[in-house]
C-alpha cells in the first residue's frame, strides 16, 4: 500500500502563462489562470494514466481538492454570476472548495453530495476506505465520509468548526492574511462567530448583514444555540500561540 500527497503550486499566484499557453501574455491573469487549471487537469490525467499503466487504478482511491478559495485578483463565473476570489477570508469564497473522490468499482459514478466536510475528515475516511481498524480515530475531530462515497447515507456532519489566526505575531492585523484570531462554527446555512455575530450564508454569502438577534425565528434561535454549543466545546485560544508576543494593532473598523 502507498499514500501519495501531491500539493500543486501551479494555480497559485502569481499567474504567468502555463507551459502550454498560446498567445502568451504575462499580464493576463484571468486567461493564464484558466490555462493553469487546464494544465493542472492534464497533470492529474498523467497521474491517473500512470496508475493504469502499473495496474493500480482499480485499487487506488484518488482524492482531489483545493485548500482555499481563489485569489481575490480573479473573478470566476459561477451559476451565472461573476464572483471575486476569497482566498484568505473566512467567508465561503475563501473556505468552500471542490472535492472529488474517485475509485473505480468502489465509488459509484455521477454522485453529487452536499454534506459538510472538513479536512480533519480525510484521515478517518482513508482509514475506513482501507479497511483498517479505526483505533482512536473516532475520538478526534474527523468524521469519516467514506459511506457517502459508496453511495450510502453515512453520518453527515451537522456542523463544522473553524479557527483562523494565520500570523499571530503581525505588527498590524486585518481581515485577510493577517487576520485577527477568529473562531466560528457553521452548519449548512448558518455561521456563528465567537463574537456572537450570526450570518445566513444562503442569503448573505459575503456576510455583510448580521442576523438580528431580537427578530430571530425559532429555527434561527435553535441554530444559534447549537452552534454556540460547538464553540463552547473547543478551547477559546490557540494552543500553539504565545500570546505574550501578540502585539499587533487591531483595526477598530473591523467587523470581527
Regions picked out by a protein language model, each given a short descriptive name:
Residues 1-4, 56-62, 96-97, 155-157, ...:
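Loop/turn elements at helix/coil->beta-strand transitions in domains of secreted/extracellular proteins
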Residues 122, 168, 175, 192, ...:
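Long, internal low-complexity/basic segments
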Residues 4-16, 64-70, 141-143, 164-168, ...:
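Short, solvent-exposed turn/loop segments enriched in Gly/Ser/Thr/Pro and often Arg
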Residues 70-90, 107-111, 115, 120-203, ...:
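C-terminal cap/loop subdomain of S1 sulfatases and analogous C-terminal strand-loop tails that border
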Residues 2-7, 37-40, 44, 51, ...:
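Beta-strand elements within well-structured catalytic alpha/beta cores of enzymes
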Amino acid at each position: 500500500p502507498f499514500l501519495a500527497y501531491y500539493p500543486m503550486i501551479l494555480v497559485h499566484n502569481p499567474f504567468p502563462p502555463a507551459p502550454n499557453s498560446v498567445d502568451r501574455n504575462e499580464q493576463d491573469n484571468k486567461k493564464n489562470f484558466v490555462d493553469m487549471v487546464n494544465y493542472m487537469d492534464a497533470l492529474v490525467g498523467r497521474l491517473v494514466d500512470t496508475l493504469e499503466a502499473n495496474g493500480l487504478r482499480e485499487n487506488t482511491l484518488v482524492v482531489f481538492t483545493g485548500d482555499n478559495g481563489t485569489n481575490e485578483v480573479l473573478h470566476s463565473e459561477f451559476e451565472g454570476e461573476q464572483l471575486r476570489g476569497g482566498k484568505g477570508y473566512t467567508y465561503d469564497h475563501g473556505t468552500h472548495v471542490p472535492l472529488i473522490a474517485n475509485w473505480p468499482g468502489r465509488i459509484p459514478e455521477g454522485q453529487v453530495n452536499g454534506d459538510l466536510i472538513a479536512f480533519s475528515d480525510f484521515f478517518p475516511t482513508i482509514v475506513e476506505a482501507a479497511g483498517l481498524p479505526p483505533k482512536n480515530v473516532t475520538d478526534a475531530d474527523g468524521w469519516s465520509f467514506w459511506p457517502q462515497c459508496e453511495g450510502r447515507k453515512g453520518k453527515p456532519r451537522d456542523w463544522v468548526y473553524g479557527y483562523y489566526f494565520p500570523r499571530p505575531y503581525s505588527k498590524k492585523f486585518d481581515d485577510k492574511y493577517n487576520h485577527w484570531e477568529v473562531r466560528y462554527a457553521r452548519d449548512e446555512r448558518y455561521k456563528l462567530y465567537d463574537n456572537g455575530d450570526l450570518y445566513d450564508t444562503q442569503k448573505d454569502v459575503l456576510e455583510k448583514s448580521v442576523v438580528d438577534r431580537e427578530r430571530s425565528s425559532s429555527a434561527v434561535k435553535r441554530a444559534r444555540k447549537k452552534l454556540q454549543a460547538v464553540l463552547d466545546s473547543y478551547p477559546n485560544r490557540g494552543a500553539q500561540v504565545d500570546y505574550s508576543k501578540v502585539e499587533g494593532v487591531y483595526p477598530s473598523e473591523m467587523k470581527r
